Amino acid sequence: MPTPHIEAQKGEIADKILLPGDPLRAKFIAENFLEDAVQFNQVRGMLGFTGTYKGHRVSVMGTGMGIPSISIYANELITEYGVKRLIRVGTAGSVNEDVHIRDLVIGQAAATTSAIVRHDFPDFDFPQIADFDLLDKAYHIAKDLGITTHVGNILSSDLFYGGPDAVKVGKLGVKAVEMEAAGLYYLGAKYKVQTLGIMTISDHILTGESTTSEERQLTFTDMMKVGLETLIAE
C-alpha cells in the first residue's frame, strides 16, 4: 500500500537501497548501473527505481536535502516496505586539509547540529554511528578498486549556508560536512537495520575548490560503484 510520500506497492522495493539526495542522481544510477530498472516512485519528483545489479535485486531513490527529508523517506522505506540495508550516496564539503575534491569519505560516525535525537532522548547525547559490517565492506571494496577513500567522523549540519566553524570542526578530525547521514544512522539504531553514508567531496570549505552541479549529478561514479558493491556484499 502506498505511503504519503512513496507510491510503490508492497514488493516493488528491494530490501537493499541506495539513497542519493538528488532524485536525478537516482535516475542516473538506475539508467547506467541497473538492469531492467522499473520506476516505482515519482511523488513530489522524488524518483525511485528497482532493478538488478550483478544479479541482485536492488533499489535506488532520492531523499532530498537535510535530515527531515531523508528521515521521512527512510522511515517509510523501513517500516512500510521492509528495507534492511540503506546506503546514502551523496556529496559533502571537506573540512580537512588531507581530504580533497572528488575523494570518497565513509562516515564512521556523524555528529550533528540537528535536534532529531533530542526529541527522543532529551537528557543525553546519543551517538550516531554507521553499521560496522557495512563500513568494513565499503572500505575494503573501495581499497580494492583503488579509490582514494577516507574513513572517519563527519558532521551532519542543518545549515547549508553558515553553521559550525569549519576550521574548528576540522581540528577535531572531522573529515567532511554534509546534511543527512546522522538522521539515517539514528534510524538504523532505532529500527535495527544497516545504514551507511558514502560521500564524494564536491566542495572544499577550507580552500574554496568546488565542482559543478552537472558534475555532481552525472559523475561521481566511484561512489556509486562502491555503494552498489557494498549493498550486495555478503
UniProtKB/Swiss-Prot annotation:
Site (Important for catalytic activity): 216
Residues holding phosphate: 21, 25, 44, 88-91
Any Gene Ontology CC annotation: cytosol
Key words, A-Z: Glycosyltransferase, Transferase
PROSITE patterns referenced in this protein's UniProt entry, alphabetically: PNP_UDP_1
Pfam families: PNP_UDP_1
Protein's GO biological process: purine nucleoside catabolic process
Gene3D superfamilies named among the record's database cross-references: Nucleoside phosphorylase domain
GO molecular function per UniProt: purine-nucleoside phosphorylase activity
Function: Catalyzes the reversible phosphorolytic breakdown of the N-glycosidic bond in the beta-(deoxy)ribonucleoside molecules, with the formation of the corresponding free purine bases and pentose-1-phosphate.
Protein name as catalogued: Purine nucleoside phosphorylase DeoD-type
